[in-house]
């Protein structure tokens, strides 16, 4: 915790506190004398006094933010959206393909579907649209959507049943808007969802959109497609896509039109045009400040991150631990990057040098190779027959490209195997790659690649004759390296110029014997902070808004459950409560259930947590140690021991927060909460389910899980 930091509470914050009943006027009047300059103090006293007199009249009108039932809107883009190109009435049936994507997979499927559909149906015009680019506001969504007659939606579900950043505005308008009756009666549609069956809210966004479209008059062409990334989502997409063609044949092809009906479609392998440069040429240099970072702009998003230095890095585990957890602080002073307690930070880390050198060897190229990528021909006409993502900033060296932009450690998709097969000079290797990518090789792919967690580099090493050119490697084989998201473990009330991250090192063996090192966690562990060197580490970062917030009424009870690095957002919560307490706010009770293996090894932030207890911002610290006693003890066991207290806090309007592993811990905690409600509330199982659902709908049961 940053000691001695000033509390960032504005005069309007203080006046609002009176209006919202979180503090009395007398405490705030005394506080203003010590926190506000003489020039503003008298004005604030007048404002505070007036507010106190009016509080009885306006309290019922004060709007209180609901922390759940709203989807946080992503930051506005830096650049104004392009004006939509006017549609030309060429007599063709208009088909719109929408996508909501977080990592690019949904966008890739949308483009692959549209490319094949274009080849099949020459009398139709296909548009591929990012849902965020489709409309500037709710009115435009309403105006344009009601005119769509044939549309397909590719929608990923992210986090705890949330829409992706670029689908957040659309989903908020679509799912939370007023009942519009048969609003979509003109539309025929199909929906394909991308999710992971291990998560509770599997494909929630696609399910909601599919159901609401049908309820509001749209005609479903094919059943909802449920892509499962826990298995082979490409196979799910292929199976769903094959259901569509017979339906589109009836809609988009005349009876006498047999062109393309029986033709076999072969997708083109995406390939950038590559220009190589003499690295000795003084005109071609890598410019560190010209690689897409948005430093200096008023707002940022994950497509426009800002470059932030690492200010502090320290190990949180003791030397007795065989694992590692890093506390890292990004310096955001002067960048104009702001965050709220409970938000997430997206971090673009680099591949470690060992991984990069392995890739250079497999590609057979010098790390000093300077090149640029292009999506057009030399004459400026677009490359046809492919769906290339925008190229990363170039010219750059091969080493830079592999370190910053290429995902080298994930398992390769089947489309990547097809591309590798096309450039394998050894026939047996090409045949094996083609088999793994084929429907008949489905089981072999699932076992040899997915179950064994083989990375792209491992697969390339198994097929050494496959030497794809750089345009194919970056266009069709190596996906773009994605940002890693972390729950911010600080509060801007205490650390306004720092974003704190709490990150456990990913270092584990795979079935093949390879040691998998997490890209971002390894980078953080090895980062050089400003406090050690002026030549410190830095990374592009951005803030993603979250609904994981403390209640607006600070007097309400708070229950926090977060083992391991799940503690991160609660550290920010407790910093926030400390700032509010120092400002005179009335705080309700707060209980933290934390879990780790052993007090002497991995009890992270132990001293800070004890200080929060002593300061009165944490009422009870309850720790489960899973490796100390004869039996393993976890947070859900401690919850059972405190069942009466938990039920009393919930009954008093308390909020329940859970952060951590979605597949294990969060499920166990969810079951424990059901048991507590059933036993302490004397409810049957059906009423328990309804009660917990209502807590979620009211924003009083929130989860930040991964």
Curated annotation (Swiss-Prot):
Binds 1 FAD per monomer. Binds 1 FMN per monomer. CDD domains: CYPOR. It comes from the Eukaryota. It comes from Piper nigrum. Keywords: Endoplasmic reticulum, FAD, Flavoprotein, FMN, Membrane, NADP, Oxidoreductase, Transmembrane, Transmembrane helix. It is a single-pass membrane protein. This is NADPH--cytochrome P450 reductase. Residues 95-245 form the Flavodoxin-like domain. One of its GO terms (biological process) is piperine biosynthetic process. The chain crosses the membrane at residues 43-63. This enzyme is required for electron transfer from NADP to cytochrome P450 in microsomes. It can also provide electron transfer to heme oxygenase and cytochrome B5. The gene is CPR.
């Amino acid at each position: 915790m940053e000691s001695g930091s000033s509390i960032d509470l504005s005069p309007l914050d203080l006046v609002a506190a009176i209006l919202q009943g979180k503090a009395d006027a007398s405490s705030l009047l005394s506080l203003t004398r010590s926190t506000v300059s003489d020039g503003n103090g008298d004005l604030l006293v007048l404002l505070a006094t007036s507010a106190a007199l009016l509080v009885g009249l306006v309290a019922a009108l004060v709007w209180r933010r609901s922390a759940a039932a709203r989807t946080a809107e992503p930051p506005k883009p830096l650049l104004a959206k392009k004006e939509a190109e006017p549609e030309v009435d060429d007599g063709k049936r208009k088909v719109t393909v929408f996508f909501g994507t977080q990592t690019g997979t949904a966008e890739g499927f949308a483009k692959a579907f549209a490319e094949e559909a274009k080849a099949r149906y020459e009398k139709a015009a296909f548009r591929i649209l990012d849902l965020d680019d489709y409309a500037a506001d709710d009115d435009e969504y309403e105006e344009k959507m009601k005119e769509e007659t044939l549309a397909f939606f590719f929608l990923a579900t992210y986090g705890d049943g949330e829409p992706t950043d670029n689908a957040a505005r659309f989903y908020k308008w679509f799912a939370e808007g007023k009942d519009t009756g048969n609003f979509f009666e003109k539309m025929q549609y199909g929906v394909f969802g991308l999710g992971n069956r291990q998560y509770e809210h599997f494909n929630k966004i696609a399910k909601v959109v599919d159901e609401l479209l049908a309820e509001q008059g749209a005609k479903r062409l094919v059943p909802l497609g449920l892509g499962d990334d826990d298995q082979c989502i490409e196979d799910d997409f292929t199976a769903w896509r094959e259901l569509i063609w017979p339906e589109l044949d009836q809609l988009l092809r005349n009876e006498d039109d047999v062109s393309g009906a029986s033709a076999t479609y072969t997708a083109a392998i995406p390939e950038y045009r590559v220009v190589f440069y003499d690295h000795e040429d003084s005109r071609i240099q890598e410019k560190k400040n010209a690689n897409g970072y948005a430093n200096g702009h008023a707002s940022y998003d994950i497509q426009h991150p800002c470059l932030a230095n690492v200010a502090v890095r320290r190990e949180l585990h003791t030397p007795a631990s065989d694992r590692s957890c890093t506390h890292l602080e990004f310096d955001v002073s002067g960048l104009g990057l702001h965050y709220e307690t409970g938000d997430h930070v997206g971090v673009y880390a680099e591949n470690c040098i060992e991984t990069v050198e392995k890739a250079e060897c497999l590609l057979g190229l010098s790390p000093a190779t300077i090149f640029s990528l292009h999506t057009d021909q030399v004459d400026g006409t677009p490359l046809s027959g492919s769906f290339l993502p925008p190229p990363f900033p170039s010219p750059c060296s091969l080493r830079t490209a592999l370190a910053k932009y290429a995902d080298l450690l994930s398992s390769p998709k089947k489309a990547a195997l097809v591309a590798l097969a096309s450039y394998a000079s050894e026939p047996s290797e090409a045949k094996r790659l083609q088999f793994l990518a084929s429907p008949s090789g489905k089981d072999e792919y699932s076992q040899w690649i997915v179950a064994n967690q083989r990375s792209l580099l491992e697969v390339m090493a198994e097929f050494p004759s496959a030497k794809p050119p750089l345009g194919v490697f970056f266009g069709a084989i190596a996906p773009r390296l994605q940002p890693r998201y972390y729950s911010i473990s600080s509060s801007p009330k205490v650390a306004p110029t720092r974003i704190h991250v709490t990150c456990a090192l990913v270092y584990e063996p795979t079935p093949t014997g390879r040691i998998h090192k997490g890209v971002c966690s390894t980078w953080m562990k090895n980062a050089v902070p400003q406090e050690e060197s002026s030549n410190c580490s830095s990374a592009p970062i951005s803030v993603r808004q979250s609904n994981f917030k403390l209640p607006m009424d600070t007097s309400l009870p708070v229950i926090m459950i977060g083992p391991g690095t799940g503690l991160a957002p609660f550290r920010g919560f407790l910093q926030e409560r400390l700032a509010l307490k120092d400002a005179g706010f009335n705080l309700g009770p707060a209980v933290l259930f934390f879990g780790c293996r052993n007090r002497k090894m991995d009890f992270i932030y132990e001293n800070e947590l004890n200080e929060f207890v002593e300061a009165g911002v944490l009422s009870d610290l309850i720790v489960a140690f899973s490796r100390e006693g004869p039996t393993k003890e976890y947070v859900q066991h401690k919850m059972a021991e405190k069942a009466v207290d938990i039920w009393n806090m919930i009954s008093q309007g308390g909020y329940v927060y859970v952060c951590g592993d979605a597949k294990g811990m969060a499920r166990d905690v969810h079951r424990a909460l059901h048991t507590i409600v059933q036993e302490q509330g004397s409810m049957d199982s059906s009423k328990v389910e309804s009660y917990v659902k209502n807590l979620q709908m009211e924003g009083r049961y929130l989860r930040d899980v991964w």
